[in-house]
Amino acid sequence: MKVTVLVRPKDGILDPQGEAIRHALDSLGYPIGQVRQGKVFDLEIDVETREQAEALANEAAERALANGVMERFEVVVA
């Protein structure tokens, strides 16, 4: 089963990469107010149900893919 895990900085956490991208876009004339850079993990999980896939992806995100102090994540089951 295909699962996507989206990892982003939590609100209020400094995002220097996002700020650098925002600055570059601004210098190119794009009126962007804020950019938050994150990570995307596309997983193929061998389970029977969507619920199992979501549970395993949540566990993997909490334990390995996201830093719970600085990042939040979202699991999307395809």
Language-model-detected regions and their locations in the chain:
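Long, contiguous binding/interaction regions
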Residues: 2-47, 52-78
